[in-house]
């Protein structure tokens, strides 16, 4: 055998009965998942306790063996929590590491734990429990982010700023209204989280390898003990399924995309050229060479982490796309994608919540910019429709000529003399000046969901009652 490739003296004791020799060292390395799936230890122990309790209740194992198993598992949980537990790559994964330690602690009774169970349904359970718990954390984190935006929206319901399309000044809006747009976005993310929790609320344990088991188990009992609504209905689908992980990654990718869009605006708005916001020192960094710099690194890192989260979704979709039904070892590659995406999303939400709570809003700069770029041109067109009876397309054309005149003269629309306005369209009167201020513009947008402060406060109240 070539250098760097050797066999272990014996095969894995948990499955090696039909093997004459152990795996090659490279096989052992590629096969092992303990380096990352040890993160599932609490879920694995919780599932094993529920399984052992059910086996005893059904008379499949003795109450005495069940008590030994539960006591041993509690001991192992304490060992792992304290850092005293030694994980072994030779034992491949978290399931067999725990089972081997259990055998060392309680002897032959440990061998009864795996009755009516396979690692296929065991890992499906552990992973599903972990994802469910992570979704619950994400729901709580999103609720905190929404609350931060609601507070800023309430504070700035009347703060006027430019609204943009194509990153060009479009119409005046309020900063409170802009904040509420993010409330809606992150509210949808939270709704997706809640739906996913409900959608995946089925227990896989008891499906065994793929065909179920001939032992008289009670899957409803274990489902209830583990906090699931009910057991899964098809044993083949149960061990084939990673939809719950894909749903989590999809939710994470959409939420991360929303966070990235927010991060982009924070980066832009904090530049001297915009100057709409001032980031706190707590969420900024400096430069090693330029002493004047205050960099929005937290926002930039949130923006960058979106690529990692999106990549995790694509990676797992690609893993799953060619698999026949039931378990394939490919599915071992599911966890690192989810673990990494969950960590990235959790950190990104926390960072963004902190930035939103701490950021200083420069209302004077926002208001000054709100009137730039002829942002009240639509108000002029609307006035021509209401007061002069013009069809909107004609009003649009007239307003375009007015904007061209203002550009030529280098002034705002409100600074054009009435005579020059009337030279373009004789129906224009001095009352038009009343709609050309940014304050009048936002106050007039009273349609449901509009930017008028009165509407923004209604939006805030609606969300306060639901957050």
Curated annotation (Swiss-Prot):
CDD domains xrefs: Argininosuccinate_lyase
GO cellular component annotations of the record: cytosol
E.C. designation(s): 4.3.2.1
GO MF annotation list: argininosuccinate lyase activity
SUPFAM superfamilies in the record: L-aspartase-like
Cited Pfam families: ASL_C2, Lyase_1
Compartments where located: Cytoplasm
GO biological process, any: L-arginine biosynthetic process
Metabolic or biological pathway, per its Swiss-Prot or TrEMBL entry: Amino-acid biosynthesis; L-arginine biosynthesis; L-arginine from L-ornithine and carbamoyl phosphate: step 3/3
Catalytic activity: 2-(N(omega)-L-arginino)succinate = fumarate + L-arginine
Family: Belongs to the lyase 1 family. Argininosuccinate lyase subfamily.
Protein name in the entry: Argininosuccinate lyase 1
Gene name, Swiss-Prot/TrEMBL: argH1
